[in-house]
Regions:
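Short, Lys/Arg-enriched charge-dense amphipathic segments
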Residues: 152-164, 253-264, 274-283
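Active-site acidic/histidine clusters and adjacent loop/turn architecture
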Residues: 1-123, 260-313
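An amphipathic alpha-helical core segment
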Residues: 178-275
Length: 314
């Protein structure tokens, strides 16, 4: 890419990223919190500044002079060099300049094991590898409040839709089949033994389910961890998708989110279960399309990652 093309692509990416993070940044400046939307900024370890970093993807090089105006900002240091990138001097028609591209050798050396683990995880959790489980009905959020006492809920700013006794009964009268470690680990001690399995970090690559809302949300995390290898528009697409997943996650939860402008999916009823599955299927298809894009982007690099691979829990 020419410097002009790269700068234009960067500006477009930054503008889109800023639009996506603006509500969170504005709330933070006011000292306010949002129990639904802030999740993507507080649970996942990526700042709005990281989200706005533009990457063309490992297969694209661009004129390094495009970064001059960003010296000392983000991942560009004061000398104009960029972290996780390397420069190659080219000469053409008497003119010379540096072309900047992702530093594959360094990435493989320092992060190849994590990338290999992520590739394995995403490959195993695709619809091409396994059918999705559409019978969990979002009960993980209910298991996280099961038999808790007053003041012990994760989201104290949100009231429960049902009484504590009724909420507990929903857990007891349904089957907990959560397969995702990062949902299961928040189950209350009383709820964990009720789950059909005991997910672990070690078993995650085999257990993650393509229909799981949290597995879909995690695509945002994996796309960010694979920077600068992926085109950064994939990360923004994953972020937007994660917000849609989060909305269903909370609308189907025991919490009453109507005070924040959201609805209710009453999974304690048969009608609510049907609505949850209908929306879950649509979101799972979108998750799988994003997963496919990530895998396609890094597939040629897997042999490079494999050389440095060792057991890794990312």
């Amino acid at each position: 890419m020419s410097a002009e093309e790269a700068m234009h692509a960067r500006e477009e990416h930054e503008a889109r990223a800023d639009r996506l993070s603006a509500p969170h940044r504005e709330r933070k400046a006011r000292g306010e919190k949002h129990p639904i939307e802030d999740f993507l900024h507080t649970y996942y370890p990526f700042s709005p500044g990281q989200l706005r970093r533009w990457h063309p993807g490992w297969q694209v090089g661009y004129e390094a002079s495009a970064d001059q105006a960003h010296s000392g900002v983000g991942d560009v240091d004061s000398d104009g060099c960029r972290r996780w990138y390397s420069d190659m001097q080219l000469q053409s028609g008497g003119a010379s300049g540096a072309v900047r591209a992702a530093d594959l050798e360094r990435f493989a050396r320092e992060r190849g094991d994590a990338a290999y683990w992520i590739h394995r995880l995403l490959s195993n959790s695709s619809f091409a590898e396994k059918p999705g489980n559409f019978s969990c009905f979002g009960l993980h959020e209910w298991a996280m409040v099961y038999r808790l006492g007053p003041g012990e809920k994760r989201h104290e700013s949100l009231p429960l839709r049902l009484s504590a006794e009724e909420t507990n009964r929903v857990v007891e009268e349904n089957r907990l089949v959560c397969s995702h470690i990062d949902a299961f680990r928040f189950f209350t001690p009383q709820a964990a033994p009720l789950n059909a399995s005991r997910p672990t970090r070690e078993s995650q690559p085999m257990r993650d389910d393509p229909a799981c809302l949290h597995v879909g949300m995690d695509l945002y995390k994996w796309s960010m961890k694979l920077a600068p290898l992926l085109p950064s528009d994939i990360a923004l697409d994953c972020f937007e998708h994660a917000l849609d997943l989060r909305i269903l996650d909370m609308e189907a939860s025991p919490y009453d989110c109507r005070g924040y402008g959201y609805g209710i999916v009453p999974i304690e009823t048969e009608e609510g279960k049907r609505e949850y599955v209908r929306r879950q299927r649509l979101l799972a298809d979108r998750s799988d399309a994003l997963r496919t894009r990530i895998l396609a982007a890094v597939e040629p690099l897997v042999p490079l990652f494999a050389k440095s691979s060792r057991p890794c829990a990312s």
